[in-house]
Amino acid sequence: MSKELFLEIGTEEIPAGFLPKAMADMEAIVTKELENARLAFGEVKTFATPRRLALVVKGLPTVQPDAEITALGPARNIAFGPDGTPSKAAEGFARGQGVDVASLTLVSTEKGEYVAAVRKESGRPVPDLLAEILPRLVGGIPFRKSMRWADLDVRFARPIHWIVALFDGVVVPFAFGNVQSGNVSRGHRFMANQPFPVRDFAHYLDECERHFVIPDPERRKETIRREIHRVAKTAGGHLLPDEGLLDEVAYLVEYPSVVHGTFSPDFLKVPREVLITSMRSHQRYFSIVDDAGKLMPGFITINNTLTEDPSVVVKGNERVLRARLSDARFFFEEDQKVKLETRVESLKNVVYQQKLGTSYEKMERFRALAEGLADLLNPAVKAKTSRAAFLCKADLVSGMVGEFPEVQGIMGREYALLQGEDAEVAAAIAEHYLPTQAGGDLPASDIGAFVSIADKLDTICGCFGVGLIPTGSADPYALRRSALGIINIILDRGCRLSLEGEIGKALELLSAKLTRPAAEVMADVLEFFRGRFVNLMADRYPADAVDAAIAAGFDDLVDAEARIGALAAFKGRPDFDSLAVAFKRVCNIVKDGVDQPVDAALFQEPAEGALFAAFQQVRADVEARTASGDYLAALTGIAALKGAVDDFFDKVMVMAEDERVRTNRLALLTGIARLFGGVADFAKIAA
């Protein structure tokens, strides 16, 4: 009969941001431990509140199954002498495995024959195994930051105060630090902070409800979602959606209650984004909007307790928010006393990065890049692009951005509009930070796109140029996000440009700052972009189509995606596999290529002439289709060669003894390979 394991780790308040990952890590660790222990099990569920991490595992046996364990020892020639006598190595191995040396067997492996010891291992009682597994589980949860407490050697996100560990309702005994496992949990810190016994998981859930704790974060989240929408409607408006904040507050409380408050309508004179940021980032408040989407003078906050007099909580929250918004209004009014273009000079006193100079120097570099992009792609907006690039970092030295960094760019836009700047320039000031996250909004204008690409490209090339290259675990300058942002902007707006050319311009502008050879930096940055582009395309298209098309070049990203899309569509043909095999044979035999004209006079087999004639017939059309970017039509034209290619390989020995004949045949195949090589490298196609 299957049994249940229940574990709860009771702690001091753990930061909300730690909990989702901790839940996933708990599930992964216990799954691996149980599998390693040869234990079958069913559903695994994890739970978290600020004060507890818990898990339940269903379907466990009471006894571990018996097993036959085979352990490899030394190689045969080491384990036995020429006469078959066991060596000291064999005797030591047998002794270590607890078997008689005479029972050793031989096992064949890829590396040769080895001795092996086969022993039977009787299954142990599962509670005994869990007493060893659970301490490793508790101590193995990786947190971004952990701490020691008292004079203990153990670490955890926050000090542990109790542990509940039950298997089939019976305590699994173990200690972690100075805490001994038991069957006693505790209720809500403020509303029911007393111990209560636990019989099993179902009983635990019932007792938690009685003690004002909702262990399941998804249930807390749905409770909060339902209530904040209800309260917003009662207030005469609608909730401003914010899934990120909802996720966060669900891990800040054990028993959520919703509170509605208001603030003076006078504060609505402050830009909407500032008010939302102040409420969201600093107070974890939800905003309310009217039917037109206009911000209303109210907020919703989530409390961790039920109160007899909610008005006390409301007044306290309103008082705190009033102080915050008063600061915001003060900065907003004071900042307007200084023109944005005047603030630009102050960027000379702001160090962007020690080796890369000031923010003013950075602005000058990416301004030149942005102007070049405008020259190339839309000369009509060059002047506005230059102006937007000049002003876009000025709000960094404003009081508002100093207090609320999240509104950088937004405040630049607002101040620019208030000071009479062109509306497109003002919009681009905010847009140049986009996208701020994966899948986020992209610049809506060419001006914003050019400044955004230029700023991000300067950042990437500058950091790579002074050795600040992202590692697997660290990317402090968000270079991956910047590269992906550039790629998405280019694809979104159809910017036909040379990626290598723009990187070269950026490196030239950075030449006085580079601490590495420019050629090395160029190679590294191109590879960095290639990796991001491949990952992005692999989410949209078959991986082999991506690899094959990119192998033919990715300097023009718009063109590269067009080739990938065409190849992915071409793969849908019923005869694609046989086509791919034929063209892969061509690619594989002419890896280096032969650069010389084909001489029909050297043909010795009819299949040679037939292939050459077919090639000549489609060549001009395929090249024209390729040049115009109609890659699917180009591939369809190339497919017409399939029969002649197959016939050629069936009837012609490419590597003829006569060097001139051999070279002529390779030249013919080289021409064909280069015909479709402008679209993709078929050698990369899985077929």
Curated annotation (Swiss-Prot):
GO terms for biological process: arginyl-tRNA aminoacylation; glycyl-tRNA aminoacylation. Its EC number is 6.1.1.14. It catalyses: tRNA(Gly) + glycine + ATP = glycyl-tRNA(Gly) + AMP + diphosphate. It is an enzyme of class 6 (ligase). It is found in: Cytoplasm. Its main location: cytoplasm. Keywords: Aminoacyl-tRNA synthetase, ATP-binding, Cytoplasm, Ligase, Nucleotide-binding, Protein biosynthesis. Belongs to the class-II aminoacyl-tRNA synthetase family. This is Glycine--tRNA ligase beta subunit. The gene is glyS.
